[in-house]
Amino acid sequence: MAARMTIMLPLAVALICLLQTEPGMAAHSHIRKVLQLFRSIELDDSKKSFYLTAAKYGIQTQLREPLVRFAGGFAPSTRLSEACVKNAIARIYEIEGEFYAKFSYACENHDPYSVECLEEAQDDYPTKLGELFKKTKKCLRE
């Protein structure tokens, strides 16, 4: 009886560990894919540094991190739609362009390229990124 327990106990523990790591490994691969696609985003480095910081922070907090959390909950058998993420990234460039326009030449109440224009332009930017997250979330699974 003791010999049987000596063999069965390690096998049971190994099986439990294997079952626990399987979803985590899939989640890890989904997260890694989303992050890899987001690393392809390149904003124009010639723009003001405080603007770039605000733009990147918005993308990170309103879109990338929520998508990573969402993709992390996928089952191992779920396929991640790369096309969906790539479409979202293309839309990011459009939203960032609108944000930059409000910060620069379309700024009405302050000097263009000023911190005041940035603060004024930031009102709409996170909202649009949040809406993009909601749309992307719907098509993320193939």
Curated annotation (Swiss-Prot):
A GO cellular-component term linked to this record: extracellular region
Signal peptide: 1-26
InterPro entries: ALL3/gSG7_salivary-like_helix
GO molecular function, one term: toxin activity
A Pfam cross-reference name: Aegyptin_C
Transmembrane parts of this sequence: none
Alphabetic keyword roster: Complement system impairing toxin, Disulfide bond, Secreted, Signal, Toxin
Intracellular or extracellular location(s): Secreted
Superkingdom field: Eukaryota
Biological role stated in the UniProt entry: Salivary protein that moderately inhibits the alternative pathway for complement system activation in the host.
Protein name: gSG7 salivary protein
Source lineage: Eukaryota, Metazoa, Ecdysozoa, Arthropoda, Hexapoda
